[in-house]
Amino acid sequence: MEQEIYQNERYKAILTILNRLKKVSVQDLTQRFGVSEVTIRKDLSFLEERGKLVRTHGGAILAEDEGRLRAIAIRQAEHPAEKTAIARRASQLIRSGETVFIDAGSTCAALARTIRDMELRVVTNSLDVLLELVDSPGISLFSTGGSFRPEACSFIGPGALETIRSLQIDTCFMGTTGFSRDGVFSSQNVIESQLKSAVIRASRRAVMLADHSKYGSTAFSVFARAGDIDVLVTDSAFNHTEEVAATGIELVIADVEPVLKVNGS
């Protein structure tokens, strides 16, 4: 029990050091904790499997910018009307019988709610999507598996990557944290980005779902550039159509239904 407690404390300490320095070496950690290189390498492998860091030659780097992470409940509460509109419009791009991938994230979860009555094969790394579609009779549901990342309710890591690389996907529907003006898409987690990139490569068509607020922002790790994405579905508040057209991405606009206000509210 004491060894297990010390091990957990070491995991926390490694992540604290990484958050401060952004990278660590096996040699430095060995000296800090007074344990063998084998032990430190096992620690780094354990943390990598859980999406906390990325192994490098002789050490590790931080997998995500924890200072910019937000709870999934907060993200789900942002721009709900826009996300619903985007999801409905994106569902019109799906043909019956297709194999589609639905990414993790609040907009992609909204997409899952709109396709419950369709006949499809759905591959996903999202717990929310799995729960949304688990009782849909026409949906053949397939999970990537992998290590669970609570911050995003998603599965990532080597197991998920291996699954994706063995599949052929007709259309993938992807979410993004960052969408820069020059058509670069990014997320807050390196290992998550690795999976996103693999999904896009495994797909005949890549569709990005992003509300207008994402435009002009950047995140920690790039997973796609304009040439990798076929279609961008966004909401009617998006006013950068010429910039997107210049990147070669097809732009699809979703009309957002006005919110009706009740008298006295």
Provide a role label for each language-model segment:
Residues 2-12, 16, 20-29, 34, ...:
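Conserved phosphate- and dinucleotide-binding cores of soluble alpha/beta proteins
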